[in-house]
UniProtKB/Swiss-Prot annotation:
Annotated InterPro entries: RemA-like
Organism lineage string: Bacteria, Bacillati, Bacillota, Clostridia, Eubacteriales
Pfam family for this entry, one: RemA-like
Family named by the database record: Belongs to the RemA family.
Protein name: Putative regulatory protein Swol_1238
Signal peptide: none
Disulfide linkage: none
Length: 86
């Protein structure tokens, strides 16, 4: 079994096959998702105290906060797919 990993900033890595969505944290529904995850204990804060710029939702319902832009995470994810095909 080959696990693909994606760097989400500051040396933090997430399994690419577990990512369901990468979204911006500005909207009210996403803020609610973050708060509910915090209350349930399924929030992973990988921002190192910096501003949250991307919210990654995993298939296990875990919510991961990243200080890297959503576009950057998506580009890293898609570049992994390109490297696999070569």
């Amino acid at each position: 079994m080959d696990i693909k990993l994606v760097n989400i900033g500051f040396g933090n890595i997430v399994a690419a096959n577990r990512i369901v969505a990468i979204v911006s944290p500005e909207s009210a529904p996403i803020k609610r998702i973050i708060q509910e995850a915090r209350e349930k204990g399924i929030l992973i804060d990988a921002t190192y105290g910096r501003r949250t710029r991307a919210v990654i939702i995993a298939d296990s319902a875990h919510v991961i906060l990243s200080a890297v832009q959503p576009e950057t995470v998506a580009n890293r994810l898609s570049s992994k797919d390109v490297n696999e095909e070569s």
